[in-house]
């Protein structure tokens, strides 16, 4: 009896597939329209190189450019910063060859490409997650960066500036799960800073 039932179900399924074929057109198109750029790499670009890169991005259909981290804390505690910052945290920092934030915004202004500025990052993110003082410090420094970058560049390049990128991406590793309350606290510090700029 079970075999007869299975056979009937198979026949009904086949008839349904024949009578009600699946739609041939896609309901949505996948679209690749954004890209990342590293500050350390692009800090040596002049405006001509930026324009070449932006032309290539536009040709590829890019609408969004994400600058990865614009301030990086090495495991020895030193910072490298890729924009002209006056923050006390960066008093002894090494500065990149050029102000990547301004160069990206200036060259993308009027191009139709929107720029998201990556905040800070530190080397131990992948091994410490949200534990320890480094993550807390990073979130506080990133909040200060938001205020500084917003006040310094957004009114100059309103068509290019689009938002922020939280550089230490989350993963599903065990440390992230264990440190999620600390991660949430740090992200909230950054969200509060963003809300103050609106």
Language model: regions and residue ranges:
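Bacterial Sec-dependent signal peptides at the C-terminal "C-region" and cleavage site
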Residues: 8-29
């Amino acid at each position: 009896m079970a075999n007869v039932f299975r056979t009937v179900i198979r026949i009904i399924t086949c008839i349904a597939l024949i009578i009600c074929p699946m739609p041939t057109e896609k309901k949505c198109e996948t679209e690749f329209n954004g890209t990342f750029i590293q500050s350390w790499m692009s800090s040596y670009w002049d405006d001509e190189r930026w324009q070449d890169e932006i032309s290539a991005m536009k040709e590829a259909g890019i609408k969004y450019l994400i600058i990865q981290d614009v301030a990086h804390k090495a495991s020895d505690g030193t910072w490298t910063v890729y924009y002209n910052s006056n923050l006390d945290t960066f008093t002894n920092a090494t500065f990149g060859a050029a102000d990547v934030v301004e160069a990206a915004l200036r060259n993308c202004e009027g191009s139709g490409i929107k720029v998201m500025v990556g905040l800070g990052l530190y080397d131990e993110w992948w091994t410490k997650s949200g534990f320890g003082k480094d993550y807390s410090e990073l979130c506080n420094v990133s909040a200060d960066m938001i205020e500084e970058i917003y006040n310094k560049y957004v009114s100059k390049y309103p068509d290019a500036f689009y938002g922020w990128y939280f550089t230490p991406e989350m993963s599903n590793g065990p440390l992230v799960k264990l440190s999620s309350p600390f991660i949430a606290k740090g992200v909230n510090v950054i969200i509060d800073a963003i809300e103050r700029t609106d």
